[in-house]
Design a protein with these regions (language model features):
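Bacterial Sec-dependent N-terminal signal peptides
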Residues: 1-29
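Lipid interaction determinants
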Residues: 20-142
Length: 142
């Protein structure tokens, strides 16, 4: 009887530990962001815009729609994957449909962290998240 109980406990323990195993993908670093990226998803919708990161200068630039955008990137090695884009500026051309541009700029303002999508190096797809852990956008290396 004791053997049966020990066997059941062993099987149960193995099942619990196996179910707790979490597959962790590749961890994105700040230097992975360097270069040109396509914004392929914004708030769950497909998008085709370009954003560029200059890691050495802690800056970003790109096209927000019809206007150019530029700004600073706040990142600290002490807080991995935490990132912010404070005060992204744009040119001021008037365009017929500014809704998508506003949505992109609002999403950039809400970003607080980034994470690689996939489990291969080099990192070629990164998701940007807001404070409530909502995926705001996905960028893909050009």
């Amino acid at each position: 009887m004791k053997k049966y109980i020990y066997l059941c406990l062993a099987v149960l323990s193995i099942g619990i530990f196996a179910s707790c195993k979490v597959k962790k993908g590749v961890e994105a670093t700040f230097s992975d962001l360097d270069g040109s990226w396509n914004i392929v998803e914004l708030n769950g919708k497909a998008l085709n815009q370009v954003i560029e990161f200059d890691v050495a200068r802690h800056s970003l630039s790109g096209k927000a729609g019809c206007n150019r955008m530029m700004g600073q990137v706040e990142y600290s090695d002490a807080h991995k994957n935490i990132i912010k884009f404070p005060q992204v500026a744009t040119t001021r051309m008037a365009c017929p449909d500014m809704g998508g541009e506003r949505e992109l700029l609002q999403a950039l303002d809400k970003v607080v962290r980034f994470e690689a999508e996939g489990d291969v190096r080099p990192v070629n797809k990164i998701a940007l998240y807001g404070t409530d852990n909502t995926k705001l956008m996905v960028i893909e290396k050009k």
